[in-house]
């Protein structure tokens, strides 16, 4: 009886720990958000954090950081770049502990940026590639669940997306080579990008023009008239589907998470690959 109780107790504990590591994902404007928390001083702050593979470090909104958290910015003379290569001044701080899905990350470097003033959204915190690269993360976009996997576990998957050898603008950036309407194109996998964008140099003609709002860490929100390719046939590994693209003058385009909706995938920074589970 005692042994049976211990076995049942162990199974219950494992089940609880496993479920605790699963975090619900919510979507807004093609952006993914998860619940997290961080500590600063003697206080803990719960946050809804956006997941951004196109951002090197974590980011905290400046108003929230200073007024609500009492954070003092450091390194005010650091000059940084956004994904569009616009230069901007960035302040940094170090967060003692960041908790995401039952995982604790210590001494987290964090940029302090006016997110609400530039993006006109409720972004308070962004989880960047610095944190994402430290673990194996499984994104199940069918059930909208994020899970941190054991690095030593056996991974089951159906196909692989290998990162291209081209260097991204920033450390831990993910560059993918795909085909659009049968033509080769390179993209930065940027879950923080609101739109999918295709380089004009690929040679695909636009189907129409549309007015869209744009913003980044260097510039506030503006409205732009942009050429668009509607329902372009996108192919990458085992993925084949129509996607709308805005055209860009940059040599590398942008892919947000849209091409992975209704799928489950694992981002493996160590082996530079994305594993398609479903």
Sequence positions of predicted segments:
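Pepsin/retropepsin-fold aspartyl endopeptidases
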Residues: 20-278
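Bacterial Sec-dependent N-terminal signal peptides
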Residues: 1-24
